[in-house]
């Protein structure tokens, strides 16, 4: 088993861990900015084996879900690997989802065991109030979770066995449980490693939660494939980001657009040696505003590679090539290791530069949604393409441009308006850190447009500035009627702005008002 750009990885995640422990036992694979001790491949292998045997001794059936309700850190990472190593299905619980969604995940996954740490104990207890199940709670903060009995045998594992059950954010309904096999999880890490030409000498900075597909596949599984390493942080910190990049000799990082915007508007800058060492920063989970990307690169001198991925595709679908390859600002790039196409509303396949739904096929695509046949059928075409729910087009060079989510499309007076157009116009203002446009019901037009922004501290900007900016860039029809100023916009676990929730947290919703 070797990392090759032209062939997806064979075997299981366990096989790849075994390989590294045998061939590079003393190489550091994971470090932790919170002070947890470093892990070498051999140390990880030893610890994971002991925890996996502990799980087998609990008489858990092969393939059963075991949930993790823990903060980023060494214990969570070890337990993630151990669940897979033991032949079970890891179910990371989204700590930002709220009690009802967590309770649903616990019930729906049928997990009988949940790992928790002290900082997340209250979160878990609140979630358990939303479910009738009674899983065994294993608190890693005060439990010895390892077994050394050599007579305990681990389950045999194959590439097509279930590995991961991860729940979608559920912003438009009940969260769905996405099933990935060992094979598709490895392929998710492989597509990232191929696109970014990751080497064993590369070291990633992970500031995203491991219960999110980006944090998990991009900065945990991709280094497993490439033989590189990753530094895992408890969470994103504007004040610590560049310091951590320098301290740990980071060569690349994976973030989301809101983090890029916060860094851009922050006071700290990377040192010259850090700038030279950083090959690239990776942006995913939401479209990156053109002005934000350009301003970031101009200030910090670090190229940003915009990408696109889903929970259903073990993260990456598309990526821009690394410099000196051609990057197209405003596009998440081209396919690496999988295929993409555009499906038109009538079901026909793509015509270049024509907007339709983005579809993907490849080894990193999920198996199905757990116990949700109807949703699985709607998501896959008859010939096996996964419909992403994103609208976009492919240009003459094969680059995909995303115009928005199908469910977020604003339809005003019968005209389709992409909220991203409005977001990008607002991000052109120097004081805007976060921006999102959204639809409001309207008796005359069906829907009208409002937007929410977060501004830099001490900004004196007023609503008229933003309305006039949108008028000049978009025309009055596409411009928002109202701007909401907020301290924070609602976001999911990766930091992606949850546009649909803006209806609930702003005062703009008034179905009876006529405009």
Which stretches of residues belong to each language-model region?
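Conserved pre-ATP/AMP-binding loop-to-beta segment of ANL
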Residues: 25-26, 149-167, 174, 197-203
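Conserved structural elements of the adenylate-forming
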Residues: 45-53, 159, 178-199, 204-207, ...
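Gly/Ser/Thr-rich phosphate-binding loop
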Residues: 250-255, 264-327, 341
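Conserved AMP-binding/adenylate-forming core of the ANL superfamily
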Residues: 26-73, 77-81, 98-103
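Conserved ATP/PPi-binding loop(s) of AMP-dependent carboxylate-activating enzymes
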Residues: 334-337, 348-379, 415-417
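Conserved AMP-binding/adenylation subdomain of ANL enzymes
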Residues: 186-203, 213-251, 266-267
């Amino acid at each position: 088993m070797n990392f090759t750009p032209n062939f997806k990885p064979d075997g299981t995640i366990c096989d790849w861990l075994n390989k590294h422990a045998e061939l590079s036992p003393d190489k550091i694979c994971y470090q932790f900015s919170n002070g947890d001790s470093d892990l070498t491949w051999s140390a990880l292998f030893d610890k994971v084996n002991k925890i996996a045997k502990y799980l087998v001794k609990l008489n858990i059936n092969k393939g059963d879900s075991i949930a993790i309700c823990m903060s980023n850190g060494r214990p969570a990472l070890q337990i993630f690997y151990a669940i897979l190593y033991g032949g079970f299905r890891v179910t990371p619980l989204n700590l930002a989802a709220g009690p009802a969604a967590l309770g649903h995940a616990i019930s729906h996954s049928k997990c009988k065991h949940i790992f928790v740490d002290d900082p997340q104990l209250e979160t878990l207890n609140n979630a358990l109030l939303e479910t009738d199940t009674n899983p065994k709670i294993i608190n890693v903060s005060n439990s010895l979770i390892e077994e050394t009995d050599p007579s305990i045998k681990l389950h045999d594992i194959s590439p097509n066995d279930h590995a991961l059950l991860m729940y979608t954010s559920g912003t438009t309904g009940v969260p769905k449980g996405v099933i990935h096999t060992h094979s598709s999880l490895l392929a998710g890490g492989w597509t990232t490693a191929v696109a970014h030409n990751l080497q064993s000498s590369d070291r990633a900075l992970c500031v995203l939660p491991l219960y999110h597909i980006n944090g998990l596949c991009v900065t945990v599984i991709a280094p497993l494939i490439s033989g590189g390493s990753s530094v895992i942080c408890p969470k994103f910190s504007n004040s610590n980001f560049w310091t951590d990049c320098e301290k740990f000799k980071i060569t690349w990082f994976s973030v989301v657009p809101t983090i890029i915007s916060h860094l851009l508007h922050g006071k700290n800058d990377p040192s010259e040696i850090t700038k030279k060492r950083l090959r690239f920063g990776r942006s995913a989970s939401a479209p990156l505003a053109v002005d934000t990307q350009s301003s970031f690169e101009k200030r910090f001198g670090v190229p940003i590679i915009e990408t696109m991925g889903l929970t259903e595709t073990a993260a990456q679908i598309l990526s821009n090539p690394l410099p000196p390859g051609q990057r197209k600002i405003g596009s998440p790039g081209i396919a690496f290791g999988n295929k993409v196409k555009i499906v038109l509303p009538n079901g026909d396949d793509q015509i270049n530069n024509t907007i339709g739904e983005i579809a993907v096929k490849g080894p990193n695509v999920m198996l199905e949604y757990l116990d949700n046949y109807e949703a699985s059928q709607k998501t896959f075409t008859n010939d096996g393409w996964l419909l992403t729910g994103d609208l976009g087009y492919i240009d003459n060079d094969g680059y995909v441009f995303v115009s928005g989510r199908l469910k977020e499309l604003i339809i005003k007076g019968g005209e389709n308006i992409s909220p991203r157009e409005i977001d990008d116009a607002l991000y052109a203002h120097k004081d805007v850190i976060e921006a999102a446009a959204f639809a409001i019901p309207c008796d005359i037009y069906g829907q009208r447009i409002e937007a929410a922004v977060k501004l830099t501290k001490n900004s004196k900007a007023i609503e008229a500035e933003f309305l006039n900016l949108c008028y000049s860039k978009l025309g009055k029809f596409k411009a928002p009627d109202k701007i909401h100023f907020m301290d924070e916009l609602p976001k999911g676990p990766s930091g992606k702005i949850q546009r649909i929730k803006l209806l609930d947290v702003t005062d703009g919703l008034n179905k009876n008002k006529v405009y």
